[in-house]
Amino acid sequence: VAPTYGDAELKLGPKLRQHREEIFLGCKTQERTYEGAWRKLDQSLNRLGVDTIDLYQVHGLEYDEELDEITGDDGALAAFREAKEQGLIDHMGLTSHGDPGLILDALDRIDDLESVMFPLNPVVAGKDDDEYDYEAVLARADEKNVGTLGIKAFAGGSWPPTDELPEADRPFANWYRPVTAPDEIRERFDFAAAQGLTSVINAGDPKLVTMILEAAADYDGMDEVAQRSLIERVRHDDSPVPEQLHH
């Protein structure tokens, strides 16, 4: 959950408090400064009605100057570290669907980083350019014993331009166009899970959640031949990530 997700924190709060011991709670902030990060952390704790957040993450890192800012003396990570010392957060991470090279730099520069959230799916795995090389992020994180959370596993491409399909008419709430057929969802989950990620993150639209959970429950591995076959089939498809390529 994140403050930028509308009133999601307020809606989640009541059920979260009922089942707090059963839930690993991840939250994010787009603030890059010390003061801003503290302010948003306090807000999220209050809105969620909890005393601690299991994983608190820098949300949507995209540019080099942002990395410089969060790692500075007055940056967000200084606030994260204080909050961790005070028991308000248990772990600290960052998320990005931007340049893999930036995530690699973050892994090298932030010694106490505990998780990274980044895209991984057969479309980006099939691209030859470094700007799609999220597999390098997975490898570096594994070397450093940093947790890996895979997002955009179910991304099927970008939506048509808004003059062709207005946002209000999109059949799913995701900012990217998701795959929606049960067999496609199962195939995408199997691929992501087979990469050795710590966790595969669900898609954002509630209409897809049940199918993804069913795919997870039925997961029985995916061999190398099946992975390569899927990559070859979709490698020329459009990818909505890295995000900066679409600005």
Where are these regions (language model features)?
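Beta/alpha (TIM)-barrel catalytic core signal, keyed to glycine-rich beta->alpha loops juxtaposed to Asp/Glu
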Residues: 7, 61-247
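N-terminal binding-site loop/beta-alpha segment at the start of enzyme catalytic domains
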Residues: 1-23, 79, 85
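Acidic (Asp/Glu)-rich catalytic clusters
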Residues: 12-21, 42-51, 106-111, 139, ...
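A short, structured active-site edge motif that brings together acidic residues
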Residues: 22-33, 55-60, 119-122
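Active-site groove signature of glycoside hydrolases
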Residues: 45-68
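Short acidic capping loops at alpha-helix termini that bridge into adjacent secondary structure
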Residues: 20-23, 51-55, 90-91
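Glycine-rich anion/phosphate-binding loops
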Residues: 32-40
